[in-house]
From Swiss-Prot:
Chain positions found as Phosphothreonine: T767, T772
UniProt keyword Repeat present: yes
Protein kinase domain boundaries: 606-888
InterPro entries, sorted: Kinase-like_dom_sf, Leu-rich_rpt, Leu-rich_rpt_typical-subtyp, LRR_dom_sf, Malectin-like_Carb-bd_dom, Prot_kinase_dom, Protein_kinase_ATP_BS, Ser/Thr_kinase_AS
Main location: membrane
Signal peptide: 1-16
Membrane spanning residue stretches: 545-565
Modification type Phosphoserine: residues: S736
Residues holding ATP: I612, G613, R614, G615, S616, F617, G618, A619, V620, K634
Protein name: Probable LRR receptor-like serine/threonine-protein kinase At5g48740
Catalytic activity field: L-seryl-[protein] + ATP = O-phospho-L-seryl-[protein] + ADP + H(+); L-threonyl-[protein] + ATP = O-phospho-L-threonyl-[protein] + ADP + H(+)
């Protein structure tokens, strides 16, 4: 690139508005400054803090600047800054001013973070004002700049915040291939220039170039104001012409050097700029900290160039140019500290935490990354792993399935969170060491505690636990404290818990002990006064006879008890087998579904060879019946199996459901410890697969196909809500539960969580929340009140998936777009169809899309009473489908 180094040529910038500049007046109002730079109030970029203005003397004049201060010492105070994604890097400049605004003469110190990295500690005792400059490689459309209080050092303050676009490809030798790096400016020196700083408009990117006189030892400078032609095509940083036209040049010595102090030891990135502004072409070596980095570098007349160096683990910096031929010279230099950005927490963890925050109904202040630069409130981390979660005194009511996604947890504290029912959704937390569920209203141990193989502390005190302590707790070999105080537990404790090294606390229970005492009459265990009665010889003889008779009688009685016990056990086994047979006969009388033997199931699945799905209930296998029909076989885990009556009811319910848009129930197997359900197999896979799963890469669904799927699924749900008797709430509507056949007809599947209700049951209160994160109705979660409108909410999420072509919870985009409902709802309400799936762009009828989007938005309304019925949803979707068909017909006719 050829350009003319002529200062006057930059006057054009004095009269044009700079493109891409963001200038925030922190605590101030909007105004236009010199060179047409627009400063705006920071009110739209941060929600916390107080504002004031400070006036102070500066030389012979006074300055008055706004300040935003943050009295709350807890957490992060963050600015969310928009960034253009077409840029490769941006400059972030923050100015911090104290100047005794509070008349306390106590300048604060605080941390500054950009994204996940603490970049610096601002100490206004050292410099006031303090200017911090950072170069950030663009990898998102926004970033967070946060202030974090230092304990005992006052409250953070800020005066201004600037975002400036940098030249494309600039600073690439440091940032290229390393998107997890931030550059923090240490020095930017306009070598050889002594008449103040240079910035915009001389530098169109508004970098501040400091004058050279402050850096010793000082050498002669050389300045050219004339017209000079320079070839600078290889300088991607694009330094301003006014910087390149000056140079520090060796006067009489053999070397030219800069000795620069560094704030902190670390890795540094150095750029040296050279311009051939002399008719000579000097040659010299470049030495950094006594190490030769460039042995023979020549500055060619009329050429401009750069040298880039990275120095690792240094605490001081000396740059020396040693003469080889003619006088060494340098036009400018930049020095940056290289800051590594810590790895981010897993998307699964972030998704789970965001869902948990949403359903607490509280703003926990969780934004950006949970672990860096500092952990969120209520959280502790090890590196980028969330290892502890503390949510006491929050009305959770149940442990959401989402907690099970926090796989790195070592400590989970949910004490005093109004939990009820059974302990659930913790079985996947294999690393958990401490579990505190005390001071709740839990009634049952559940079936998952035995899976917590690394558990050391289990605190269940002050609950409503009933019955006996499960033997399975003895499997927790690392357990050292089990607190069961103040519950309603009875019976002997398992002997597997009576071991050295395990403390078991049991006070406050009706009858709980390691001894095999009877709990039929608790009062019999109370100590009574002992009374001594004198006995004569005759009585002693009679007593001996009585003792012998008693021993003999006791032995006979013990034998009798063993006989009775064996009889009862045998009778119970016969009764259990009789119950299963009776249940099978009862099911046969329905004449609605087939009863399979376990042998038949094993043959159909080829010994359970092909797994096609897995969930909390068990696994699903692909099978083939003797007549060639393909089936999906759902096998329940032992711990998820139902009692006989419950299983009969479930099979009866499934046998009654017959609709073209519901997956057909083919039969079942019910044998001791075996509960298996058999459904028709649909070869087209799930809707989720077609939208963003493996099938989406091979065949994408167009808009009319998506509407057809939506109509089919709505028909199935409408039958459940309004066509069957009793009516049924599905409870787990999601795109992976909408299956497609080979002709792309959709059917709703998986009624394992479904709930029957009559017209008298306008709502149903549950003690356990069932469903999938991202689809759960927030009102159902918070109130435990289940209605058909909960299905409508979940189906609304599916409609948004069809429109946007993405998952309900996704960490791939910006933090704002993580939750599909919260992201899509305001955009679609504003008619912003830019968020529609890219695959659908320019292929849909706007009226059809608008109608589908409108009903989807109503479905996901937070207030259940304002949501439409599924029948109304079906009507609107049919209308949208008809509009799209008409649009396609008109387009074909036009073509």
């Amino acid at each position: 690139m050829l350009f003319w180094v002529l200062l006057s040529s930059f006057c054009v910038f004095c009269f044009s508005s700079p493109d891409g500049f963001l200038s925030l007046s922190c605590g101030g109002s909007s105004y236009t400054a010199a060179y047409n730079i627009s400063w705006v109030s920071d009110n739209d970029y941060i929600e916390t803090g107080n504002t004031t203005t400070v006036t102070y003397a500066e030389g012979n004049s006074t300055s008055s600047v706004p300040i935003r201060l943050f009295p709350d010492p807890q957490g992060r105070q963050c600015y969310k800054l928009p960034v253009r994604k077409d840029l490769s890097s941006v400059l972030i400049r923050a100015t911090f001013v104290y100047r005794n605004y509070d008349s306390q003469n106590s300048p604060p110190a605080f941390h500054v973070s950009l994204g996940r990295r603490i970049t610096s500690t601002v100490d206004l005792r050292t410099n006031d004002p303090w200017i911090e400059e950072l170069v950030w490689p663009v990898n998102n459309d926004s970033l967070l700049l946060c202030l974090l209080a230092v304990k005992g050092r006052g409250i953070p303050v800020i005066s201004s915040l600037e975002v400036r676009p940098l030249p494309l490809g600039s600073y690439k030798y440091s940032l290229e291939g390393s998107p997890d790096i931030i550059l923090r400016r240490s020095y930017r020196i306009n070598s050889g220039y002594t008449n103040g700083t240079i910035r915009y408009p001389s530098d169109p990117f508004d970098r501040i170039w400091d004058p050279d006189q402050s850096y010793s030892p000082f050498h002669a400078s050389w300045s050219f104001n004339g017209l000079t032609k320079l070839n600078s095509f290889n300088i991607t940083e694009n330094p301003p012409a006014s910087v390149l036209k000056t140079a520090r040049i060796l006067a009489r010595k053999e070397s030219l050097s800069y000795t620069l102090s560094l704030h902190t030891p670390g890795d540094y990135y150095i750029i040296l700029y050279f311009a051939g502004i002399l008719s000579l072409s000097p040659s010299f070596s470049v030495t950094i900290n006594d190490e030769v980095k460039q042995s023979d570098y020549t500055v060619t007349s009329s050429e401009a160039g750069t040298l880039y160096f990275t120095q690792k683990g240094i605490s001081k910096l000396n740059i020396t140019l040693r003469k080889i031929k003619f006088n060494p010279q340098v036009s400018a230099l930049e020095v940056y500290e290289i800051l590594q950005i810590p790895p981010e927490a897993s998307s699964t963890t972030v998704s789970a935490l965001k869902v948990i925050e949403q359903f607490t109904g509280q703003d926990l202040g969780w934004q950006d990354d949970p672990c860096t630069p500092l952990p969120w409130n209520h959280i502790e981390c090890e590196g980028n792993r969330v290892t502890s979660l503390f949510l006491s005194k929050i009305n959770l009511r149940s442990i959401s399935p989402t907690f099970g996604d926090l796989l790195d947890l070592k400590t989970l504290d949910l004490h005093n969170t109004s939990l009820t029912g059974a302990i659930q959704n913790v079985g996947s937390l294999k690393d958990l060491q401490k579990l505190n569920l005390s001071f709740n209203q839990l009634e049952s141990f559940g079936s998952e505690l035995e899976d917590l193989v690394n558990l050391e502390v289990l605190d269940l005190q002050n609950n409503s636990l009933q019955g006996s302590v499960p033997e399975t707790l003895g499997k927790l070999k690392k357990l050292r404290l089990l607190n069961l105080e103040n519950n309603n537990l009875v019976g002997p404790l398992p002997q597997s818990l009576n071991i050295t090294g395990l403390e078991v606390r049991i006070t406050g229970n009706p009858c709980l002990s390691f001894s095999s005492i009877s709990c039929n009459n608790v009062s019999s265990t109370i100590d009574t006064p002992q009374v001594t009665i004198p006995i004569n010889k005759k009585q002693r003889k009679q007593n001996r006879i009585a003792i012998l008779l008693g021993v003999s009688g006791g032995a006979l009685f013990a034998t009798f008890l063993v006989f009775v016990f064996m009889s009862i056990f045998t009778r119970r086994q016969r009764n259990k087998e009789r119950d299963i047979t009776r249940a099978q006969l009862k099911m046969q009388n329905w004449n609605a579904s087939r009863i399979f033997s376990h042998k038949e199931i094993k043959s159909a699945t080829r010994n359970f060879k092909e797994v096609i799905g897995r969930g909390s209930f068990g696994a699903v296998y692909r099978g083939k019946l003797p007549d060639g029909k393909q089936v999906a076989v759902k096998v329940r885990f032992d711990r998820t199996q139902l009692g006989a009556d419950s299983f009969i009811n479930e099979v009866h319910l499934l046998s009654q459901i017959r609709h073209q848009n519901l997956v057909s129930f083919e039969g079942f197997c019910y044998e001791p410890k075996r509960q298996i359900l058999v459904y028709e197999y649909l070869s087209g896979g799930s809707l989720a697969d077609h939208l963003y799963g493996p099938r989406s890469k091979r065949h994408s669904l167009n808009w009319v196909s998506r509407l057809k799927v939506a109509v089919d699924a709505a028909k199935g749900l409408d039958y459940l809500h309004n066509g069957s008797e009793p009516r049924i709430i599905h409870r787990d509507v999601k795109s992976s539960n909408i299956l497609l056949d080979k002709d792309m007809n959709a059917k709703v599947s998986d009624f394992g969580l479904s709930k029957q209700f009559t017209k008298a049951d306008a709502s149903h209160i549950t003690t356990v929340v069932k469903g999938t994160a991202g689809y759960l109705d927030p009102e159902y979660y918070s109130t435990l009140q289940l209605t058909e409108k909960s299905d409508v909410y979940s189906f609304g999420v599916v409609l948004l998936e069809l429109i946007c072509g993405r998952e309900p919870l996704s960490h791939s985009g910006s933090p704002d777009s993580f939750n599909l409902v919260l992201w899509a709802r305001p955009n679609l309400q504003a008619g912003a169809f830019e968020i529609v799936d890219d695959i659908l762009k320019e292929t849909f009828d706007p009226a059809s899309m608008k109608k589908a989007a409108s009903i989807a938005i109503r479905c996901v309304g937070r207030d259940a009473s304002g949501r439409p019925s599924i029948a109304e949803v079906l009507t609107k979707l049919k209308e949208a489908y008809s509009l799209q068909l008409s649009y396609l017909a008109a387009s074909a006719h036009t073509d």
